[in-house]
From Swiss-Prot:
GO terms for cellular component: cytosol. It holds the Pfam family EF-G_D2. Residues 130-141 have a biased composition (Polar residues). Residues 57-76, 142-190, 289-299, 315-330 have a biased composition (Low complexity). Residues 92-103, 110-124, 191-205, 239-250, 259-271, 346-358 have a biased composition (Basic and acidic residues). InterPro entries: EF-G-like_DII, IF2_II, IF2_N, P-loop_NTPase, Small_GTP-bd, T_Tr_GTP-bd_dom, TF_IF2_bacterial-like, TIF_IF2. Residues 444-613 form the tr-type G domain. It comes from Lacticaseibacillus casei (strain BL23) (Lactobacillus casei). Residues 553-556 are annotated as: G4. HAMAP family: IF_2_B. It comes from the Bacteria. This is Translation initiation factor IF-2. Residues 589-591 are annotated as: G5.
């Protein structure tokens, strides 16, 4: 067999679960509760312990046999008494009623319910049993409740003869009196019939054999008794009716009460209650004899006092068996008690709002309202408005307050007031300087080297050799057009190189390169010597106070003279170390890679002397090397990190724009997440294309970055408006003189911002008498429809540098006759614009007839004019073409088409052989057989 649950074992052994659990724990068996399982061995152990305990209790059970025998004797006495005549029983009952009244009126007797039973004798020698004699000892377990008690049920009846049913009922009611009183409130609302059924079901050993007839209302017809005035409101029936039992019941032994009285009784604390009464339905009161009818004067008051106290009558407030109500509803009393208890209970205090202390100093801003001040002062806005009202200031909670009002309010509260000082977060130069001055946690960083020199002296070839790539082949004409930033690794050390253009147009870009560099490598061709851009590069490097390393290139060419180059450079303060100076000269050949490693070693040596360091743990700051507008990525900027570390997702302000770093790409085209100091990266995620040499600063959050970027953009726009020249009396003559000049309107679009600036500066420097260049728009990116629309509206020329027009822009330019010039070398762009300014300024146009129409029919239409119907004889007719009306070889009118239709549809063009309908704008004198010529004006190319 398997294991068995504790509760199953306890059920088999007829013991309590708790006893089994206690025995199991004493035996060391692991049992938690009645649902725990025990095996056969454990079951045997527990059985043995239970048998030992039962053996120990055997003597006590034998000692209890003597009271049992006495109980049997008393039971026999009851049976004999039941066989006596009915008259004796009636007489006994009458005396019992008298005893009951005397027992009730005695206060001490009512309070001694749990005392041992004692017998009393009347004057005639008859024995009267007290109520406590028939009480059972209180059960330790909870009994089924039955609250149907009546006053007459508590009468200690000695009548054990004819009316055995009443005796048993009274005994039963007394046995369950404690349980009934405890649960009286739960069954008050039950009907009488339901209570009777409950009682019969719960006490099977006392189940009656027949139904109990219900007494009706007392009338003359049925002869039911009425209450007797001197009997405390009881109904008294004739003794003859009470002598006949109406149903047979199981009669208990008469000595049951004595048996219970002999057993030891334990009292438990209980609330003192008045004596409960038995149910009137089961025990009908006996008529009071004439001798017992007179009562003391205090009996009525005593009964009233008992009834006022409740009297323990569970039928109080409901209809009795005779149809009368027995008082008011007990629930009302219970509700009143609960209400009094709630009123007497201590009430919970409402939570009070904690008053927060005032700040020592009120830091305010001009324009704050009462609501804003309330948050700072930890006060309600209504309180502040009330205080201001008392001070003579009428405001509402949303009205802005001036400085004096806020200080007056602070004085009333007894605190100081201080106006908040706003820090200009849009001043990037100040932030940039503060971050650069930060000397905490400095670590060595790679040097930033800028390669400078004249055009075609081999700068890009040298850098190409260093990176082992072929950058020069991708440049148009072999000339570097914009800055490139690269990193080279030598002996586990990095060097950052910047390649600057050598053309004169890129002066600003060279100056920017010198500003952000640590070391300048000046490349000079051994065969050409010092050239104008070489001298300019020297000046930029000296202005930036950057050390210069001279790389004499092309020493492999025939006719190369490095010593002559060294002599020329001494005139500009660059004296070789061999000649007693401090400038490092390295003779190299970039094409063949000669002495390249020596040049790199000299760069690292110079970097060690400079002790270059940066703090990688702070917020990143740096400089924009180049910027452009990518078709797929949007604005793209090449930046050089100078301090801190730039991370993907950092809020950033670049020049006059802002954004969040979406992605970073290094010089090899690979995505990176972090950019350390001296590392060039290409970033995306900014809102607009910044200018070259703009500073960038990383902010703590995007909100601050947005505010700083918008403020800088606003200031830049205001500065641009200030630069507009307005006409005044002082410059009126100059303005009129300039009005006589012819202007060449130009729109410049380039791939990067540096190229845009260089091309614009070069075009503005062109000097032609009577003509000047007016750059109406310059931007980075491809030529789009907006540029073409602007050019068409202002009659301007579009110059594209390393960019191409979009398909839609190209089609629109052809339609609007906008001239687009595309270049990849800056020389040709400058020369072409200069040639146009010197004599071929005004374009030449010639007329070209594109088609003719013969008028077949004319239809006058109101509010439209004359509609012409005809066929296209030759060529084609377009909607935007000019028309000329010819009649008999004479031109009658020249103008534009008003509309062009084919059937009911508006069309842009009708070809030869198709019929059409048209109108001529502002002309209606059209006749049949007139000829209409369509023509366009085409520009003659400049030769």
């Amino acid at each position: 067999m398997g294991k068995k649950r504790v509760y199953e074992f306890a059920k088999e052994m007829h013991v309590d679960n708790k006893d089994v659990i206690d025995i199991a724990k004493n035996l060391g068996i692991e049992v938690k509760n009645h649902m725990s399982s025990i095996d056969q061995d454990q079951e045997a152990k527990i059985k043995g312990m239970l048998s030992k305990q039962s053996a120990g209790k055997a003597p006590s059970s034998q000692a209890a046999k003597t009271p049992a025998k006495a109980a049997k004797t008393s039971s026999a006495a009851h049976k004999e008494a039941a066989k006596k005549p009915v008259a004796a029983s009636a007489k006994s009952n009458d005396h019992a009623d008298v005893a009951e009244h005397s027992q009730k009126n005695a206060k001490p007797a009512a309070k001694q319910e749990n005392k041992p039973a004692r017998s009393n004798k009347t004057s005639d020698g008859k024995i009267i049993l007290s109520k406590s004699t028939i009480l059972r000892p209180r059960s330790t377990q909870t009994a089924h409740t039955n609250t149907n008690h009546n006053r007459g049920g508590n009468t200690a009846s000695a009548n054990n003869t004819a009316n055995g049913r009443n005796s048993n009922r009274s005994n039963n009611n007394n046995n369950n009196r404690s349980a009934n009183n405890a649960n009286r409130s739960g069954n008050n609302n039950r009907s009488n019939e339901r209570n009777r059924n409950d009682r019969n079901r719960r006490f099977d050993n006392q189940r009656v054999t027949g139904p109990m007839p219900r007494a009706g209302r007392p009338t003359a017809a049925n002869g039911n008794p009425r209450p007797v005035a001197g009997n405390g409101g009881k109904f008294v029936k004739p003794a003859s009716e009470r002598q006949q039992p109406k149903r047979q019941e199981a009669v208990k032994p008469a000595n049951a009460a004595s048996k219970r009285s002999e057993q030891p009784r334990t009292e438990r604390p209980r609330t003192e209650q008045p004596a409960a009464t038995t149910n009137q339905r089961f025990t009908k009161p006996a008529p009071v004899p004439a001798a017992a009818a007179p009562k003391p004067a205090s009996a009525g008051s005593q009964d009233n006092r008992n009834s006022r106290r409740g009297g323990g009558n569970s039928n109080f407030g409901r209809s009795n068996s005779y149809g009368n109500r027995n008082g008011f509803n007990r629930n009302n009393r219970r509700n009143k008690k609960n209400k009094r208890r709630q009123q007497s209970a201590p009430k919970k205090e409402m939570p009070q709002r904690k008053e927060r202390p005032l700040p020592e100093t009120l830091i305010y801003e001009v324009g704050m309202n009462a609501q804003d001040l309330g948050k700072i002062l930890h006060r309600e806005p209504a309180e502040l408005i009330k205080k201001l009202f008392m001070l003579g200031v009428m405001v509402n909670q949303n009205q802005s307050l001036d400085k004096d009002t806020i200080e007056l309010l602070a004085t009333d509260y007894g605190i100081d007031a201080q106006e908040k000082v706003h820090e200009d977060i849009s001043d990037l130069d100040k932030v940039f300087e503060e971050e650069n001055k930060n000397q905490d946690n400095l670590q060595p960083r790679p040097p930033v080297v800028t390669i400078m020199g004249h055009v075609d002296h081999g700068k890009t070839t040298l850098l190409d050799k260093l990176r082992h790539t072929h950058v020069t082949e991708g440049e148009a004409g072999g000339i570097t057009q914009h800055i490139g930033a690269y990193q080279v690794k030598l002996r586990d050390r990095l060097i950052t190189f910047l390649d600057t253009p050598g053309h004169a147009a890129f002066t600003n870009m060279r100056a920017r390169g010198a500003d952000i560099t640590d070391i300048v490598v000046l490349v000079v061709a051994a065969d050409d010597g010092v050239m104008p851009q070489t001298i300019e590069a020297i000046h930029h490097a000296q202005a930036a106070k950057a050390p210069i390393i001279v790389a004499v290139n092309k020493i492999d060419k025939p006719g190369a003279n490095p010593d002559h180059v060294m002599e020329q450079l001494t005139e500009y303060g660059l004296i070789p170390e061999d000649w007693g100076g401090d400038t490092i000269f390295v003779k190299i050949s970039a094409k063949f890679g000669k002495n390249i490693d020596e040049l790199l070693e000299m760069i690292l040596l110079e970097a060690d002397v400079l002790e270059l360091k940066a703090n990688p743990d702070q917020k990143a700051v740096g400089t924009v090397i180049e910027a452009r507008l990518d078709k797929g990525k949007g604005p793209v900027a090449t930046v050089l990190v100078q301090q801190g570390t730039l991370h993907t997702g950092d809020p950033i302000v670049v020049g006059n724009t802002f954004g969040r770093v979406r992605a970073m790409t290094n010089d090899h085209g690979r995505r990176v997440k972090d950019a350390l100091p001296s590392m060039p990266v290409e970033i995306t995620g900014i809102n607009d294309v910044p200018q070259s040499a703009d500073k960038f600063v990383v902010f703590a959050d995007e909100r601050t970055a947005r505010a700083a970027g918008e403020e800088r953009a606003k200031r830049a726009q205001e500065e641009e408006r200030k630069n507009t020249n307005h006409v005044t009396l002082d410059n009126l003559f100059e303005t009129m003189k300039e009005g006589q000049l012819k202007e060449v309107d130009v729109i410049i679009k380039a791939d990067v911002q540096g190229s845009v600036e260089a091309l614009a500066g070069s075009l503005e420097k062109i000097e032609v008498k009577g003509v000047r260049v007016n750059i109406i728009h310059q931007a980075v990116g491809a030529i789009n429809e907006s540029d073409v629309t602007l050019a068409a509206a202002s009659n301007a020329i579009i110059i594209g540098f390393n960019v191409r027009p979009t398909a839609l822009a190209k089609a629109q330019a052809e339609q609007d006759d906008v001239d687009i010039r595309l270049h990849s070398v800056i020389y040709k762009a400058i020369e072409e614009v200069e040639a146009a300014m010197k004599g071929m300024l005004e374009p030449t146009y010639e007329e070209k007839v594109i088609g003719t129409v013969t008028v077949r029919e004319t239809i006058p239409v109101s509010k439209v004019g004359t509609v012409v119907g005809g066929y296209v004889d030759s060529g084609y007719i377009t909607r935007d073409a000019g028309v000329r009306l010819v009649r008999d070889g004479i031109v009658k009118y020249e103008g534009k088409l008003g509309s062009l239709r084919r059937f009911k549809d508006d069309v842009k063009e009708v070809r030869q052989g198709f019929e059409l309908g048209l109108t001529i704008e502002n002309y209606n004198d059209i006749k049949v057989d007139d000829q209409i010529e369509a023509f366009t004006m085409e520009q003659v190319p400049v030769k």
